[in-house]
Design a protein with these regions (language model features):
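Loop-to-helix entry region at the N-terminal start of transmembrane alpha-helices
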Residues: 20-24, 69-73, 129-155, 196-198
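Transmembrane alpha-helices
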Residues: 22-31, 150, 157-162, 183-212
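Periplasmic/extracellular loop-to-transmembrane helix junction in inner-membrane transport proteins
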Residues: 11-15, 43-83, 234-235
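Interhelical loop and adjacent transmembrane-helix boundary motif
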Residues: 8-13, 58-66, 211-269, 281-284
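Membrane-interfacial helix termini and adjacent extracytoplasmic/periplasmic loops
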Residues: 55-56, 103-104, 120-150, 184, ...
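Transmembrane-helix boundary motif in ABC transporter permease subunits
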Residues: 7-12, 80-111, 124, 128-132, ...
């Protein structure tokens, strides 16, 4: 009977492993085939599929001053939005968990609200504010970061909420405060290191959303990366496709880097736990 059960378990594990491989391959093909097709088009010299291929369009990316300016502005917007979002959300969410737990549902509703509002409706609300800012302060494209912080709130809130839910914020804070730590020390040296993976996830989501945003920038008459790609596609489709592929590869590299950093931190934490879990007197 035991032999039959063991054989059944091995067969089930083999089937599950094969199913995972099939799903992984299907997902890889689903994402990679369009990207490879875009890359092939961006390296094609003529209009025929059998035409010669080179990197002419890729080399022309930096020959477009408007495109370079749009890329620079989008990267700056992504950085500003990520930092502003973290500075706004992390202390607020920690404080609500510690001092105002009854406010958690209200905060969640406010943060998730932009997800239910179409982007074009947000533009209608943003337009008077940006018109006033342009007339009285500045119409620099970096002011879009105010709108983008609101836009990324739902996604970043969920990522940070999952990270804070995985640790005992109250116990860690009380322990640090009882040892004389200031609130800044509690936040910077106790809470943030324990939710570093969640912070990286939120930052990545913020960067990906800002780099891919089109509607708000277009309707507020700003020229970010996606707006410039759309305009460039009317004049030079090869360069616009090359830029689109490059932006996708950039997001992919960020994702892989995030996974690598998160894996390394988990391994270091496991080693630390094992080190302190060994009985005293035994060699390490």
């Amino acid at each position: 009977m035991a032999a039959v059960t063991s054989s059944f378990q091995r067969s089930r594990k083999a089937k599950l492993r094969a199913f995972r491989v099939v799903v992984l391959v299907a997902a890889a093909l689903f994402f990679m085939v369009p990207i490879l097709a875009m890359f092939e088009f961006s390296t094609r010299v003529g209009t025929e599929v059998a035409s010669a291929h080179n990197l002419t369009y890729w080399r022309q990316i930096f020959d477009q001053p408007d495109l370079v300016a749009a890329i620079t502005a989008s990267i700056q917007l992504a950085a500003i939005t990520s930092v502003a979002m973290l500075v706004l959300l992390v202390p607020t969410m920690v404080w609500v968990r510690l001092k105002l737990p009854w406010l958690k549902r209200i905060l969640e509703f406010i943060c998730l609200l932009p997800l239910t509002i179409p982007a074009i409706v947000l533009v209608v609300g943003f337009f008077p504010m940006y018109q006033w800012m342009g007339n009285n302060f500045s119409d620099n494209i970096l002011t879009l970061s105010f709108a983008y912080v609101i836009l990324v709130l739902p996604y970043c809130y969920r990522a940070l909420d999952a990270g804070l839910g995985a640790i005992d914020v109250k116990t860690l804070t009380e322990a640090a405060r009882s040892l004389g730590a200031s609130w800044f020390t509690v936040m910077w040296r106790v809470i943030v290191p324990n939710i570093s993976s969640a912070i990286l996830n939120a930052a990545l989501l913020s960067v990906a959303l800002v780099l891919g945003e089109y509607t708000i920038a277009q309707n507020l008459l700003y020229n970010n990366l996606q707006v410039e790609i759309a305009q460039l596609g009317r004049a030079n489709a090869g360069v616009s496709i090359a830029v689109a592929v490059a932006s996708l590869l950039f997001a992919f590299v960020l994702l892989v880097g995030l996974s690598f950093v998160g894996r390394r931190r988990r391994q270091q934490s496991e080693k630390l736990v094992l080190t302190y879990a060994r009985p005293l007197g035994k060699p390490v």
